[in-house]
Curated annotation (Swiss-Prot):
This is Histone deacetylase 2. The lineage of its organism: Eukaryota, Viridiplantae, Streptophyta, Embryophyta, Tracheophyta. Its cofactor is Zn(2+). It comes from Arabidopsis thaliana. GO terms for cellular component: nucleus. GO terms for molecular function: histone deacetylase activity, hydrolytic mechanism; zinc ion binding. Belongs to the histone deacetylase family. HD type 3 subfamily.
């Protein structure tokens, strides 16, 4: 009996030991697997952190800002969310923050555009903005005082930031989405107009001059990767120097910058001027004929020096005679001629063109922009009705 009991006990111990060893074996395997996965993840995260270009690429490829636009829509991008209305304090800045909606209303009422044919963009997300902007810069916009400095509307500093995000920065983010989408539309259809955008004073690290996000820089980085564009020309004809995109892209030989601006007004960014490939300075009081002559010469030089696959045209109307900030004396017809010249420049060379409306600080700017777009339609340079 005792002998049998010993054998039984030994058998149980042997079985328990086998189970223990088997359990330990599998536990070690699982631990090694989990450690390996965690290590791979850490390496991957470290790799992403140490390779910002890889992270930028991932963000661009995963973005939803590019989407297919049906042929029932034309290449004009706008959202009612573009317009900024913030308890009336937006009127403290000379910029007409409702001009974008007024441009579209003119085009519709004049019979050149149907509301249902307008393309509405998506809002640029934080991940989209991080393609160019730093986390620190985007976090700085959580301060209403920072946004007040950028928009040059001091009372904004006293409002809760959630209101500032909704009433000021959200419209800007929608316009950024419009600029980025415009490049895709332009490559598909030859041209696209974002009735907004052109925030050419904002760099990756700093906003200013009513420009909170660097939509031109973002648009170009998206185009490089998603559209396989290798050469982009920026034609910046806003009255002010485009120091934002110059700072961000000036040392990139894939980008050629033609900037025609008044050097006697903001932003006086002498460092950024070094990055301009073709600098055309027009002094305060420059009239229409002289301006258009200089533009013709500039476009001729640009066509000899660079062969772009995409043109970003920053078509500010602050060159208009009477504009309180631009200080130039260009007539409304002069702006129409200017826009037509740039569109013909691109059409003759079969280059897709993106137009952004940028600056313009008079109530009459909306009417002038609409008239110019209508002229482009009459000249057959754009098509404002669906095919």
């Amino acid at each position: 009996m005792t002998h049998t009991r010993v054998i039984s006990t030994w058998t149980e111990l042997t079985r328990d030991l086998a189970i223990y060893l088997l359990f330990t074996f599998f536990a070690i395997k699982v631990f090694k697997f989990l450690f390996s996965c965690n290590r791979t993840s850490e390496i991957s995260s470290f790799s992403m952190a140490t390779h910002p270009e890889a992270l930028r690429r991932e963000r661009i490829l995963n973005s939803k800002l590019y989407f297919d636009v049906p042929l029932s829509k034309v290449s004009i991008i706008y959202s009612s969310s573009y317009d900024i209305s913030f308890m009336g304090i937006e009127k403290l800045h000379p910029f007409d923050s409702s001009k974008w909606g007024r441009v579209c209303k003119f085009l519709v009422s004049d019979g050149f555009l149907e509301e249902k044919a307008i393309v509405e963009p998506l809002e640029a997300s934080k991940i989209d903005l991080l393609v160019v902007h730093s986390e620190n810069y985007l976090n700085s916009l959580k301060s209403s005082a920072t946004v007040a400095r950028i928009t040059e509307v001091a009372p904004v500093a006293f409002f809760p930031n959630f209101l500032v995000q909704q009433k000021v920065l959200y419209p800007f983010r929608k316009q950024v989405g419009g600029t980025i989408l415009a490049a895709k539309l332009a490559t598909e259809r030859g041209w696209a107009i974002n009735i907004g955008g052109g925030f050419h004073h904002c760099t990756a690290e700093r906003g200013g001059g009513f420009c909170a996000f660097a939509d031109i820089s973002l648009c170009i980085h998206f185009a490089f990767l998603r559209l396989r564009i290798s050469r982009v020309m920026i034609i910046d004809l806003d009255a002010h120097q485009g120091n934002g995109h110059e700072t961000d892209l000036g040392d990139d030989n894939r980008v050629y910058i033609l900037d025609m601006y008044n050097p006697e007004i903001y932003p006086f960014d002498y460092r950024a001027r070094r990055f301009i490939d073709q600098k055309v300075e027009v002094m305060s009081g420059t009239t229409t004929d002289e301006y258009l002559r200089k533009l013709d010469e500039a476009l001729e030089v640009a066509s000899r020096n660079f062969q772009p696959e995409l043109v970003i045209y920053n078509a500010g109307t602050d060159i208009l005679d009477g504009d309180p900030l631009g200080l130039l004396k260009i007539s409304p017809d002069g702006i129409t001629s200017r826009d037509e010249k740039v569109f013909r420049f691109a059409r003759e060379k079969n280059i897709p063109l993106v137009m952004l409306t940028s600056g313009g600080y008079m109530k009459s700017s909306a009417r002038v922009i609409a008239d110019s777009i209508e002229n482009l339609s009459r000249q057959g340079l754009i098509q404002t009705r669906p095919e």
